[in-house]
Each structure stands twice: as C-alpha cells, then as structure tokens.
C-alpha cells in the first residue's frame, strides 16, 4: 500500500520569487529542448538524445558548465542544474510515451506559464 503526505508550504516573498524564477527556467529548458528536437528532426531527419545532444546545447548539466559562460543561456547557471536536467529527461520520456502505441499519448507540447499548452 502506498501512502502520501500532503504538505502546504508558505514561502516568504523572496522564496516565492526564487521558486517562480526556478519554475520559469525549467519551463524554458523544456520548451527550448522541444524546439531543438523538433527542428533537428524536421530539417535533418535526426533524432536527438537528451544526454549527448540536448544537454550540451543548453549546458544544463554540471559537467557542461564551462559552456554556460559563453552561451546565450548563461543565465541558466543561476538555477538548480538537477531540475533543468530533469526537464530534458521528462521531455525524452514524453517522446517515448508518444511513440509507444500502448500508451496512446499525444505529441509533447510547449509549456506556458499559466497552464495552457502551446502547440
């Protein structure tokens, strides 16, 4: 039997601002990764893997931090790299689910701030 505990948090205004910025960075990485993956497939017919192709482009992993200084996404280094990597992994899982005939999942869509999906 699985059990769950619900916890309600009440962040201070500074903490709420930091959390909103972190969520925005994760949303940006997910949507940008989706754009990169769709563009590479449409233009070149290549499927990109998150570990070898997408993470170095966005420089979200710790081992790619040297790229962050020189990239236009240098602002991402202010945020938690594990959460950013998880966004890329979640996108890869969404693609796997999309092409699995048993699951009948829809194609991944871009994320928006207020819950509606762009597509």
Curated annotation (Swiss-Prot):
Note: In Salmonella spp. the spv gene cluster is encoded on a highly transmissible plasmid.
Protein name: Virulence protein VsdF
Function according to Swiss-Prot or TrEMBL: Expressed but non-essential protein, involved in the virulence of Salmonellas.
Native source species: Salmonella dublin
Domain of life of the native organism: Bacteria
Gene transcribed to yield this protein: vsdF
Keywords: Plasmid, Virulence
């Amino acid at each position: 039997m699985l059990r769950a505990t619900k916890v309600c948090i009440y962040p201070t205004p500074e903490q709420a601002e930091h959390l909103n910025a972190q969520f925005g960075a994760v949303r940006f990485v997910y949507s940008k990764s989706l754009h990169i993956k769709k563009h590479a497939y449409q233009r070149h017919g290549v499927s990109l893997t998150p570990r070898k192709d997408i993470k170095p482009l966005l420089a979200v992993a710790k081992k790619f931090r040297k790229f962050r200084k020189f990239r236009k996404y240098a602002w991402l280094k202010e945020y938690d790299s594990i959460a950013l990597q998880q966004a890329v992994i979640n996108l890869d899982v969404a693609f796997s689910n999309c092409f699995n005939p048993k699951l009948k999942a829809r194609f991944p869509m871009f994320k928006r701030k207020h819950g509606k999906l762009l597509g």
